Regions:
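ATP-dependent adenylation/nucleotidyltransferase module used to activate substrates
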Residues: 1-152, 162, 170-173
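Internal nucleotide-binding/catalytic subdomain
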Residues: 152-200
Length: 200
């Protein structure tokens, strides 16, 4: 029986790195994917650094590493929408749209087209199967719960998603990273608009 193939979105952060590590330890056929959604020539957007760290993590875990260029799609689907909202004094949440339209739409579709069964991320959320289908639950760490940012996902999207650290507190995720020797175990959590960095 073949192993379930999972494409993990590696962001360069510790959460996605531990997610990839745990899935590999559990026997899944794991690969890593890095999404390029925005890039600049200055230091305002850390895409190049994040990609280098993600690549280093994948090499350490001895798993394949792929990059996906979604710059054009991200600008059309997310950036224009949220910046128009800002102009109207609205505060659309970029992470909700990014998760719905990029990570669990474009990235998921790419994964499926290459023969993967599911995509995984380092979100602090959980998925439960019940009589009505699938339900999105909060992560066990109340300070890190990210279920709100995933609240617009469809059941189809959830059926092909995995959140390997949703049942863990952040402190335990850090400890797993340290014990596993992950190269980004002490890296600080990212800040700023999804994939863009600081916006004035």
């Amino acid at each position: 029986m073949s192993k379930k193939k999972v494409l993990v979105w590696l962001s360069g952060g510790v959460d996605s790195a531990v997610s990839a590590y745990l899935l590999k330890e559990q026997g899944y056929d794991v690969s890593a994917g890095f999404m390029i959604n925005y890039i600049t020539d200055d230091d305002s957007c850390p895409t190049r650094v994040d990609m280098a760290v993600a690549r280093e993590v994948a090499a350490y875990l001895d798993i394949p590493f792929f990059t996906f260029d979604f710059i054009e799609e991200y600008e059309k689907r997310v950036l224009k929408y949220i910046f128009e909202g800002y102009k109207q004094w609205l505060t659309p949440n970029p992470d909700v749209f990014c998760n719905t339209w990029i990570k669990f739409d474009l990235f998921r579709e790419e994964a499926l087209s290459y023969g993967y069964d599911a995509v995984a991320t380092g979100h602090y959320a959980q998925i439960r199967t019940n009589n009505d289908g699938l339900s999105l639950l909060r992560g066990v760490d109340p300070e890190k719960d990210q279920s709100y940012f995933l609240s617009a996902l469809s059941r189809e999207q959830l059926s092909q998603a995995m959140f390997p650290i949703g049942h863990l507190p952040k402190s335990e995720v850090r400890e797993i990273a340290r014990k596993a020797g992950l190269p980004n175990a002490e890296r600080k959590d990212s800040q700023g608009l999804c994939f863009v960095g600081k916006v004035n």
